[in-house]
Regions:
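Extracellular beta-strand/beta-solenoid scaffold signature
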Residues: 38, 69-90, 114-158, 178-190, ...
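Short, conserved, surface-exposed binding loops centered on an aromatic residue
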Residues: 378
Length: 446
């Protein structure tokens, strides 16, 4: 049946499973634990072959958890055994089920969080908020080669399985205190399978936002979040995850209008010292566009899976990062490389627009990218190319390349000096029509 919403939506809300219906019994009332009612509606939708579980506007509290089990191929020296590990979760979305509410876009309401709000009042200071165990797995993309990895057994608020969605709602942790921050489990956790979708969602003050565990085809779009520790984290996505039109910033908690919301200055002080906006480990052909991040210790982090060498390749378009300690931190990239275009990376005070770690040894291409702050390279064998880029607001040097190889083409430097520093272990610099009025100033110590 069609459900009438209070706030505008891009499509009709159609649902036969409304959580407040008598057969489920959810209540937007203080002190009422909605876990069982919501799970009953989710289970009913799944048993009917899938569908939308609808949540009318209101504040719904969650005060208890369920226990899940993960069977893991645990390492024992050079052999293995299987072992069960337990974790806690609040809601489990079965395949083919979408959880949908009535969502007000904060950008249209002066930042206010309105409509369907899920209040998480369980999980504070969980010892297993981001737990993992060393394990083995066979990589189907590499002739089933045996890999060492770490399997997440972390607690989570909503567990997402194949073909599930969380849309048109907000999630809030009322007991989080910016002056005494406590870890909470992941808000949204794609545990396995393909096609987990998060759309038109506001994460008001998650500790950790969305985790995509080994799977494929995650899709996060048209969403907002303040995450105090990690916003989005991707692990072993073996085909085409997508991030589109997502904004990660301290402002969404500060401007939420919800009780206890701290000042923007206080939230930024914490995230600038501790937080990472988007963290991509191995992902094969990740597509990221219109991602906006500000006020974090690290805006975008790209690198290896914990414990082994697999790293991502990706295309990033219209990614804009500002006011971060490192706008972009590149630990490593797989041999297919990373392409970044029509984007901008800005550093906060004493930060770097981009930093390449010593393990970087492949390729990153920047095309039409603005850098506000220094680009620093410590990668030994990699190639970094810049096409039609601009460099401004740097301190001593726009490019401080201590190692590696750099290609410059049609790049503009906004100062008449301090363009490039080449360290003693630098291999190659090639430049065409780049510099201040095409005059490139190089301080060569190689």
């Amino acid at each position: 049946q069609s459900v009438k919403t209070i706030y505008p939506t891009k499509d009709w809300a159609i649902s036969d499973f409304v959580v407040t219906a008598p057969e489920f019994g959810a209540k937007a009332e203080p002190g009422f634990d909605n876990r069982a009612a919501f799970q009953a509606a989710i289970d009913a939708a799944y048993q009917s072959g899938g569908g939308v579980v609808y949540i009318p506007a209101g504040n719904y509290e969650f005060r208890s958890t369920q226990v899940g089990t993960k069977n893991v191929r645990v390492r024992q020296g050079h052999s293995e055994t299987k072992k069960d590990f337990h974790f806690e979760y609040v809601l489990r979305l079965h395949p083919g089920v979408q959880l949908r509410g009535d969502w007000a876009d904060p950008a249209s309401h002066n930042g206010k969080v309105l409509g369907t709000i899920l209040e998480v009042r369980v999980g504070k200071d969980s010892p297993n908020y981001d737990g993992s165990v060393e394990s083995w797995w066979n990589d189907g993309q590499a002739d089933n080669a045996l890999r060492t990895t770490y399997t997440s057994i972390a607690d989570r608020f909503i567990e997402m399985n194949a073909g599930t969605g969380v849309t048109n709602l907000s999630i809030w942790y009322p007991e989080q205190d910016i002056h005494h921050v406590k870890p909470y489990p992941w808000t949204l956790f794609q545990t396995q399978g393909d096609c987990a979708t998060i759309e038109r969602v506001t994460l008001v003050n998650s500790y950790n936002g969305f985790n995509s565990a080994p799977s494929e085809l995650h899709y996060v779009l048209n969403s907002y979040m303040t995450a105090l520790n990690k916003g989005i984290e991707v692990h072993v996505c073996t085909d085409i995850g997508r991030i589109e039109n997502v904004r990660i910033s301290p402002e969404y908690w500060a401007n939420s209008g919800l009780p206890g919301a701290p000042s923007l200055e206080d939230v930024t002080a914490y995230t600038r010292a501790n937080g990472t906006g988007y963290q991509m480990h191995r992902s094969d052909w990740e597509y990221v566009s219109y991602l906006y991040i500000s006020g974090y210790k690290t805006g975008v982090w790209i690198g290896r899976e914990p414990g082994f060498a697999d790293a991502p390749n990706a295309q990033l378009y219209e990614v804009h990062v500002g006011g971060c300690g490192n706008g972009l931190y590149v630990e490593d990239v797989n041999p297919y490389g990373i392409l970044i275009s029509n984007s901008s990376f800005g550093a906060g005070q004493d930060g770097n627009a981009v930093y390449f770690y010593k393990d970087f040894s492949t390729s990153v291409q920047f095309n039409g990218v603005d850098f506000k702050g220094s680009v620093v390279g410590d990668g030994d064998g990699g190639v970094v190319s810049f096409e039609s880029c601009t460099f401004s607001e740097y301190n001593d040097y726009a490019l401080r390349m201590n190692r590696g190889n750099v290609l410059l083409s049609q790049c503009e430097f906004k100062k008449n000096a301090g363009h490039v520093y080449l360290g003693a272990n630098m291999h190659t610099l090639k430049s065409v029509n780049s510099g201040d009025k095409s005059k490139l100033k190089v301080d060569n110590h190689s």
